[in-house]
């Protein structure tokens, strides 16, 4: 997560540093939590949503929490082949992240909205017109 944060700040600017190491550890550990040796989350969308939710809400970094949260989510989705190689609908993702940061949605709703964004994005990628959009 620290590497993602450093890349976000290098690309977009902002103050470096961790405000609270324990909150950062908590945000990273939550999606990896287990009970009796079994992961509490196994669905990749739910795990990506948890990274987005906890990194965004815990505000462990001095600056760039929302950007880092979204980047972590997108990196996780991409590493699980759930993020097509195309332009993301920026306005929808921005609204989504701002809602998470403003406590307008809980973790379950974060998962539902992420699932909707990813499925909507996948449908757009499969549409007959997507090849035209992607070739321009």
What are these regions (language model features)?
Residues 1-136:
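FIC/Doc superfamily catalytic core
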């Amino acid at each position: 997560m620290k590497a993602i944060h450093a890349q976000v700040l290098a690309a977009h600017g902002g103050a470096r540093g961790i405000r609270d190491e324990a909150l950062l550890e908590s945000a990273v550990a939550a999606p990896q939590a287990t009970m009796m040796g079994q992961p509490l989350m196994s669905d990749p969308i739910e795990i990506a949503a948890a990274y987005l939710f906890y990194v965004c809400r815990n505000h462990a970094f001095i600056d760039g929490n929302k950007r880092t949260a979204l980047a972590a989510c997108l990196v996780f989705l991409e590493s699980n082949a759930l993020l097509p190689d195309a332009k993301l609908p920026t306005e929808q993702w921005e609204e989504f992240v701002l809602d998470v940061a403003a406590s307008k949605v809980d973790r379950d709703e974060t998962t539902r909205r992420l699932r909707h964004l990813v499925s909507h994005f996948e449908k757009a990628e499969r549409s007959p017109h997507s090849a035209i959009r992607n070739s321009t």
